[in-house]
Each structure stands twice: as C-alpha cells, then as structure tokens.
Amino acid sequence: MGAKREEVLTEKEKTRTAYHEAGHTLAAWNLEGANPVHKVTIIPRGRALGVTQMVPDEDRMNMSEQEIIDHLVVLLSGRAAETLIYDELTVGAENDLERATSMARRMVTHWGMSKELGPVSYKMSDEDPFLGGQIHKLSLIHI
C-alpha cells in the first residue's frame, strides 16, 4: 500500500477519495472476474490519496479476456464514481488511468484481443512508441 504520508486531507478531499475508493470497491464486489477486495483506506499512502487493495484467491499465471475487462472496469470505476457524484474530473485517478491504458494496450498489442485488428501481436519499437503510429502503418499496408 505504500508508506503512510503525514499530510492531512481536508474533509472535502477525504469525501471525494472515499467516493473514488467506493467506486473501485463496488465494481470489484459485483464483477465475477475481479479480484476480491482485501482492504480499503482513505489514509494517503505513497502517491495515492486512498487505496483499494484487491488480492486474488489463488496464484494465477493466466487471465481470460473477460477477467481483464473486469479488471479494467474496476480500475476506471473510481473515476466514474467521482464523475457521478461531482460531475467533474480530478487528477486523482492518474495511476488508475496509467494502469488501465497499459493493460488495454497489452490486450491489443501483445495478446491479440482486438476484434477489429484480429489475433495479431504488434510488437512496439522504440521508433514508434505510440500505439496509433504502429497500427496506422500496418493499416496503410492493407489499403
């Protein structure tokens, strides 16, 4: 969870963080492919204002596409909860967005889980660090 930070959150920040973490928690409780919730806190730790810790029931070496999608939903549910309650976005979901983007990108570029592009692995090179550039080049070849 990271080291506890000493700064004190305002009541407004605590409430917003609680809604954010509740979003993660509710999604994890309701999605079959999500890992079970182990611990939830709104005590700031590391870079996070709050943490919802999920721990798998067993060690696993493989995940189904639906389990990955459920994991993506859980990652994005904190931001969704904030948006539903406050009708505005904050920077608090930065790590969630980074992790969701990385996982979604791997679904397409490494695991062939794109219905549109098909079962192909697109290895990213240093010359084309952005997914769109690499796939755009491949699309032009097919045209």
Residue ranges and their predicted role:
Residues 1-3:
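Hydrophobic alpha-helical transmembrane segments of multi-pass inner membrane proteins, especially
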Residues 6-16:
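Short pre-active-site segment immediately N-terminal to the catalytic Zn-binding motif
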Residues 14-19, 25-141:
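Soluble catalytic regions of large protease machineries
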